[in-house]
Structures are given as structure tokens and as C-alpha cells.
């Protein structure tokens, strides 16, 4: 079953009481931009989730630029918006950045035990292009939900687990950043350029088409090739955000067992002994 929902399908169900839509628009270079765009116009009834405030935890000396939120914090955020674990609410995530931030929410929900989640194919752009209704009105809260975050530790790895796994037979370590960052030719964000030794480069943007929709499963299989057949797949990026697009891509071809190195390169390069 696909992890995506089309704009047409969402238009038919987004007002149902067991469906909640989450606007995840964000810009790393301008953290206020996504929320500003949301206030100007969004899918009617959708709530806004901010990458730094809602989809990440507190930063420390290690753990990367966007650590995972704690179960307690994520429970508080999602339950306050009316998300239920029993019976499970259908959560639909969207953005306008090629799945970069919507996929983060998709992955977090699955990591925290909530599988009833979809990502809007094509994002807000596809919704607007289809001529569907938009709104600037705040959504109505139906009341708190009973969502409880229950982590699935098998879905995530840390730096020491990556160090032990990299280079081992049957392991594909995937770097999701653009090629110039992977090759160490440029590094606009983190203090050290380069990549984890043994990693393969599959830039996250290649998972989608120019119109912002995700490539078909057949296209994804062709893109991944032999890497998707390895026993264990570990995916990272700069801070555990855009790697989730590759995890979404892999889930579409049946590899939803792939793991996220949540701290990613920004965590890895905080350990001098690993460089």
C-alpha cells in the first residue's frame, strides 16, 4: 500500500472527523517562512507543525542539528491537535519542498508507533494547481486526542551503530545529500565537509519529479538498484530531515525496514575520532 495520498483523494476526505491534515512547510534558510506562508493560505482545516519547534528536540553537543523530539514532547504536540492512537487518526502531511519536511513528520509518526499516516503527493503546489479550496482561517480544534508516542527503536541508529555497521557485508549506508556536499566540495551548514566512509550517494531530490510528485515504484526500483536489495539499509543526510524522503522512497518499494541515522552528518562530524 502506498504511503502517498493524491490531492483528489484528500479533497474527498480532509473534512472527515478521523482525518487531520498537517502543514509542514519550512525553509532551513528562513525558519519563519513556512509558518508565514501557512497563515497566508493553507489547505482548509490543516494545522501547522514547525520543524524546529514541533518535529525536533533540544540540541546538544551531539545528536545533530535536528535531534528527534522526545516521546513526551511529541505526544503533547500531536495529542493537543486532536490526533488519536485509538482509533487511529489518519494524519496527512504536506509541504512545498519536495517532501523534505512532510516526510519527516511521516517518519516520526511511524517511528512513534502511528502507522495511519500519508504524505500528500505533490504537496501544496499540487493542491493549488488542482484549483482546490484554500483558507487563511485558523483550524478548529475538536479537542485533545489520545495519541501516545511509543518509540520503535529498531527504526533508528546512532553514530556507534553506524560505525559498527559501515563496510560490513549486506549493509547499504546511504547519504541523501546533494553530490557536492557528499564529495566535500562544499559545506554550507556543518563545520566539516565530506561523508561517512563507505557511504553511497543517493540525493534525496532524485526521489521526486520536477512537478513535485514522487516517482513511481518502478522508477524508484531503478534508481536504487542493488542498494535496495541489501539486508540492512541505513539512511542519513545532514541532520535527519531530508533522509526521510529517501526512506519514503524505499517504503514505496517495500523496504520500510530501512533505518534512519537520526543525527546524520551533523552528529557524525561532532565526534573527531570518527572523522
Description of each model-found segment:
Residues 1-275:
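Cytosolic catalytic domains that perform sulfur/thiol-centered chemistry
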